[in-house]
């Protein structure tokens, strides 16, 4: 992987990630394909929304179908027939989401398989091996996603262990002869001094890109913005910056304003299945009765298949009847909305008009522009 930085506007960056499997224009949003599919979508449909890279879930694909089935096909690209690059998370977040059925040690994490209850162990080395078999174009280190809230002492211990795991991840990645990219993950909760230690330690190990982890886990938005403002300038400028698990459209806008290049989140697909649809002027809850006889498109400014062909009334009807097509059409729209938003941000950065774009984005939704505390 090669990262090319074209231009900046304030702290916002316009560039691209170059892979053997294709080019990803940044800032970029990655749809989430947890089980080897972006829910309800064919790879061709995902590509048609403008997505150039997707995310796969190491933890879930390891448990089912497993490494051996994956290797029978070649790798995850061959298994799911996605031709572009794939980033896989390390499995850490899912393991730590298991709560009481997992035990963290210096060696790794002991837990019970949520499918059948069998005892399982996952550590940095195993995570690197699974992601190698998946053929991931971007591999994420195995870390502990520090929960929120966490006091300073716990966050410090967690961050320090994640640094040790980062070195173990790097060593195993290299010993496998993996020629793809490996990203480090910055931890430290909402504490700037701990984030400083994490960034410094990861940069000393050396990675192809750096993710900001442990945000969007329940902390106030002001804390997320503050940490991004503090951390991003410390990440080497020639490396991509990835904000994990984020987020709402406004979170993408605020991340880009602070220097983030990559995002992923289940929100556009999950919300689509629940009838929450993102449009230029905010959010449409399509199951509300007021849409029953509305013959207008979901978003007059959207060029997606759904908006070009169907009315709000039809989407409302499909939702009320619990038709699978409704979830699919909603997903096509939400994914396209996110990709149109990213394309708009990229164009605004190129033209040096990012703040004008941001102002219009919020004005259309009747909301104030959040403060930006950067030099």
Swiss-Prot record:
Q: Where is this region: RNA binding?
A: 245-251, 269-273
> What EC numbers are recorded for this enzyme?
2.4.2.29
- Entry binding sites for substrate: 89-93, 143, 187, 214
Key word Chaperone present in the record?
Answer: no
Q: What class of enzyme is it?
A: transferase
Name the needed cofactors. Answer: Zn(2+)
Q: Which UniProt keywords apply?
A: Glycosyltransferase, Metal-binding, Queuosine biosynthesis, Transferase, tRNA processing, Zinc
Any one GO CC term of this protein is: cytosol
The record's NCBIfam families line, in alphabetical order, gives:
Q_tRNA_tgt, tgt_general
Per the record, the similarity remark reads:
Belongs to the queuine tRNA-ribosyltransferase family.
* Protein name listed in UniProt: Queuine tRNA-ribosyltransferase
From what organism does this protein derive?
Salmonella typhimurium (strain LT2 / SGSC1412 / ATCC 700720)
